[in-house]
């Protein structure tokens, strides 16, 4: 395993997560499947590191959480992610990498083009739909943020509430998925070894990202996020 590359990936992923409110898995999963023995172990590592990156923000601002906006989509996510995690344990790694690449590109095109013209209202059907998509993408690719972001952007009253909603959603979702991944045998010594290198990078990236977050407008944050989603998708397809 290339420990230096792992450190840099974790650093950049944590930075993006803190600035954008999502994206750790989107960024790191373009590379982690090639650094870990199996795809399932890669998703496990990505989920644990993302959980570490979101825990401080979620706990620090827990009083600002509007649970009415969070609970329905979170419950739907939990249900839909279970089957997806089981699928990872029996699916071909190369197939999953190709699917991941396509999903990343589709997600980036959605955010760059369609989301400018389609307004998402924070209704129960929207929460169920976004929660289902988020669960599938989280279980398969450790990137359950993009689908949920559309919902949180629509219902959050400001940038600060948006970030605390997404961070709490990612934290609780990753805790749940970690249990299922342990059950499927994806928490291995290789994951533990990689975590020791990644956790320090996550701490640094989160700290730097918190400084940048307060200086950027929401529009700039969105554009940066959409661009790297597309790049990650292309890289995943090329390297699969």
Report the location of each language-model feature.
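Residues within membrane-spanning alpha-helices of integral membrane proteins
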Residues: 3, 47, 101-104, 108, ...
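Small-residue-rich hydrophobic segments that form or flank transmembrane alpha-helices
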Residues: 3, 7-71, 135, 143-202
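Cytoplasmic-side transmembrane-helix entry/capping segments in multi-pass membrane proteins
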Residues: 66-77, 99-103, 122-131, 161-168, ...
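Transmembrane helix exit motif
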Residues: 54-62, 90, 97-124, 210-211, ...
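Membrane-embedded helical hairpins/re-entrant loop segments and their flanking transmembrane helices
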Residues: 106-164
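Hydrophobic alpha-helical transmembrane segments in multi-pass integral membrane proteins
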Residues: 86-88, 137-144, 177-180, 231-240
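Membrane-interface helix termini and inter-helical loops of multi-pass transporters
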Residues: 85-95, 118-119, 181-193
């Amino acid at each position: 395993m290339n420990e230096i590359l792992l450190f840099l990936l974790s650093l950049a992923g944590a930075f993006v997560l803190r600035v954008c409110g999502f994206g750790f898995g989107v960024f790191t999963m373009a590379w982690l499947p090639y650094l870990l023995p199996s795809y399932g172990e890669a998703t496990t590592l990505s989920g644990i590191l993302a959980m570490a990156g979101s825990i401080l923000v979620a706990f620090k601002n827990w009083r600002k959480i509007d649970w009415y906006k969070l609970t329905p989509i979170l419950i739907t996510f939990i249900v839909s992610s279970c089957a997806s995690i089981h699928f990872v344990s029996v699916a071909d790694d190369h197939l999953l990498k190709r699917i991941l690449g396509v999903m990343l590109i589709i997600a980036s095109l959605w955010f760059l083009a369609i989301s400018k013209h389609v307004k998402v209202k924070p209704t129960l059907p929207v929460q169920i739909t976004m929660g289902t998509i988020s669960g599938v993408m989280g279980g398969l690719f450790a990137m359950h943020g993009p689908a949920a972001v559309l919902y949180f952007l629509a219902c959050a009253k400001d940038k600060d509430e948006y970030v605390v909603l997404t961070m709490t959603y990612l934290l609780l979702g990753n805790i749940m998925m970690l249990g299922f991944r342990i059950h499927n045998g994806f928490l291995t010594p290789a994951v533990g070894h990689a975590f020791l290198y990644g956790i320090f990078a996550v701490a640094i990236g989160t700290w730097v990202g918190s400084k940048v977050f307060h200086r950027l407008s929401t529009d700039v944050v969105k554009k940066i996020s959409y661009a790297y989603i597309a790049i990650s998708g292309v890289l995943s397809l090329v390297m699969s």
